[in-house]
Amino acid sequence: MSATQNYGTGRRKTATARVFLRPGTGNISINNRSLDTFFGRETARMVVRQPLELTETVEKFDIYVTVIGGGVSGQAGAIRHGITRALMDYDETLRSALRKAGFVTRDAREVERKKVGLRKARKRPQYSKR
């Protein structure tokens, strides 16, 4: 890795994001598409920008992301986690602010498996007493 680039891996649900921070003007490129074209939902775009806005580094870096797996929400969360880790790689003093906002901790919630005899993970067939 060159000194001009910082890297972070982020994960959320089944999505994995590889994030590269390079000095620049604030462009965010996800799978060779812009942030606005990749995410249709404004909430997903907001989630991706959260660590940058918190640390006031929005216009400071160009961000290149490759993300695979999961859905829209999981991918947005994975990118946020990856950006957070890359920012900590860039400047360790940002860790406390990012930790306080809850961006450093990997969200460990996963989909619960479906059980035999049930319709879904917890939904049971209707019970008939008689």
Swiss-Prot record:
Transmembrane segments: none annotated. The keyword Ribonucleoprotein applies. It comes from the Bacteria. Keywords: Ribonucleoprotein, Ribosomal protein. SUPFAM superfamilies: Ribosomal protein S5 domain 2-like. One of its GO terms (molecular function) is structural constituent of ribosome. The keyword Ribosomal protein applies. GO terms for cellular component: cytosolic small ribosomal subunit. GO terms for biological process: translation. It holds the Pfam family Ribosomal_S9. Belongs to the universal ribosomal protein uS9 family. NCBIfam families: PRK00132.1. This is Small ribosomal subunit protein uS9. It comes from Pseudomonas fluorescens (strain Pf0-1).
